[in-house]
């Protein structure tokens, strides 16, 4: 009996020794595969370059060493918009040392294949900049808990800091934290991250404040290898304040040319100066969703906020929901590849625009020829002078690749149906705002009181009001209580307003006989 007990005990001890001795090596192989998949994703992304990788496999512990950096071309393209301190940090390579402990209890009592703790080593130049903000704290803490089935969980945190310069520039950052859970092979992953507060004080020029930022996503690969799923961006409050005027020039003509190839003069571009003021937006939210079935993708997005205060005026709520349906998946992948190529090269804005337009007309032409449908499900915006509402859809039917070079052919195969309802005073304000870039008043006349911009503004308001009244009389729109409503339809190249075919007035003809001597 004793012999049997001793033999059984020896068997248990041997089995335990085999398990606890062999399991770490087995799970070490599993951890190596997960990190190899992660390395593949890093190589495929359009933002980072992995300059080197080394993996040292051990029985109980392993080490992965990566040297990564932001792609120089991406930094060059965005460099003009970044402060020098940030450019210094982003332009230097970072060495990431992943310390891997593997075994069934690598994460303590919770069963796991491995636990990875990442150590970040920065160049001396980048380290000096980061130390000014974070002090002796590690700027980033990252751990990766690899599960028994090949999936896992990444936990990321960036510590808080309070930084101030003698110049009056100050940053108050309350940190960032969150996690990403992933499935085996990184075929899908879910992320949730939070940042409680960022307050940037730009000395006497203004300040920026963001409160309670939350970012989430649920992403997986579609059959065509599109990254589909959902995402969410939430911000409780955003405040912007500036003490100096800000000049702007929105190049709408270039946007129209990019989409339609029509050459339109710069006169349509809104230009001007935004005077010193403050903007506060509350409960800002942006959600997206995308899926694919049978090689066709459907996507939708919703943008909204509760309130926007600009100076002494309040706007909102705003609710915009749009969708794009029946989009060719392989065309979307072509656009994705082009955008990745653009990010990897040092290109001017014109070159980027030409590259995207070339792809849209060639490899991604299926986005137009696949009978897509663009929908505005809702557009509701409350203004101080009334409310805006719009809904409708635009579709292309039977377009060919050759049609993309002929606007008239495109229009014949375009169907649109939109409803608009907006306050007439808004149209007046838009005309006055646009006129600021087209008209000026002689300073001498303005000083003498014989002319002023207010005279021009009042003339424009009367012109808009007169045009609206004439169009209402002709049945092209409905005017009620200073609200303008109409329905815009395009079919077979024909435009209808309020159900009536729109006919522009003929230009007056002049001849030599009718001319004054």
Task: Indicate where each model-derived feature is located.
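Positively charged n-region of N-terminal signal peptides that target proteins for export
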Residues: 1-4
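Glycine-rich, small/hydroxylated-residue low-complexity segments
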Residues: 7, 11, 19-517
């Amino acid at each position: 009996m004793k012999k049997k007990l001793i033999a059984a005990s020896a068997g248990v001890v041997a089995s335990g020794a085999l398990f606890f001795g062999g399991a770490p090596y087995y799970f070490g192989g599993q951890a190596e595969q997960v990190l190899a998949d992660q390395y593949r994703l890093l190589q495929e992304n359009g933002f980072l370059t992995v300059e080197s990788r080394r993996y040292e496999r051990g029985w109980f512990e392993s080490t992965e060493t990566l040297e990564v950096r932001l792609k120089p071309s991406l930094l060059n393209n965005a460099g003009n918009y970044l402060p020098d301190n940030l450019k210094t940090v982003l332009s230097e390579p970072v060495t990431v040392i992943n310390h891997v402990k593997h075994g069934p209890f690598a994460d303590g009592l919770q069963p796991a294949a491995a636990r990875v703790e990442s150590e970040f080593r920065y160049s001396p130049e980048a380290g000096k900049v980061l130390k000014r903000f974070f002090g002796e704290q590690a700027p980033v803490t990252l751990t990766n808990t690899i599960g028994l089935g090949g999936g896992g969980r990444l936990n990321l945190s960036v510590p808080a800091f309070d930084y101030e310069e003698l110049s009056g520039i100050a940053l108050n950052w309350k940190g960032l934290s969150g996690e990403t859970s992933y499935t085996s092979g990184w075929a899908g992953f879910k992320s949730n991250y939070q940042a409680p507060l960022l307050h940037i004080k730009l000395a006497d020029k203004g300040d920026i404040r963001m409160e309670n930022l939350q970012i989430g996503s649920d992403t997986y690969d579609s059959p065509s290898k599109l990254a589909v799923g959902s995402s969410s961006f939430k911000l409780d409050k955003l405040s912007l304040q500036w003490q100096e005027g800000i000049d702007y020039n929105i190049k709408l003509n270039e946007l129209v040319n990019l989409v339609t190839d029509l050459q339109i003069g710069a006169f349509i571009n809104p230009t001007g100066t935004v005077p010193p003021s403050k903007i506060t937006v509350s409960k800002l939210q942006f959600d997206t969703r995308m899926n694919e079935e049978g090689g066709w993708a459907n996507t939708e997005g919703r943008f909204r906020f509760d309130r926007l205060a600009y100076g002494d005026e309040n706007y909102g709520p705003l609710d915009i929901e749009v969708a794009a349906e029946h989009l060719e998946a392989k065309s979307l992948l072509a656009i994705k590849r082009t955008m990745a190529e653009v990010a990897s090269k040092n290109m001017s804005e014109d070159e980027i625009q030409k590259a995207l337009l070339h792809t849209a007309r060639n490899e991604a032409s299926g986005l137009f020829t696949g009978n897509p449908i663009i929908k505005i499900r809702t557009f509701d915006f409350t203004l101080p002078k009334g409310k805006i509402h719009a809904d409708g859809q635009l579709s292309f039917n039977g377009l060919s690749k050759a049609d993309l070079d002929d606007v008239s052919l495109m229009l014949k195969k375009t169907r649109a149906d939109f409803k608009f309802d907006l306050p007439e005073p808004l149209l007046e304000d838009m005309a006055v705002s646009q006129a600021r870039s087209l008209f000026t008043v002689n300073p001498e006349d303005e000083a003498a009181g014989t002319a002023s911009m207010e005279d021009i503004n009042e003339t424009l308001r009367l012109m808009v009001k007169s045009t609206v009244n004439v169009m209402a009389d002709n049945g092209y729109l409905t005017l009620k209580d200073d609200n303008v409503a109409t329905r815009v339809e395009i079919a077979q190249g024909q435009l209808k307003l309020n159900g009536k075919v729109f006919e522009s007035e003929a230009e007056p003809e002049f001849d030599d006989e009718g001319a004054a001597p």
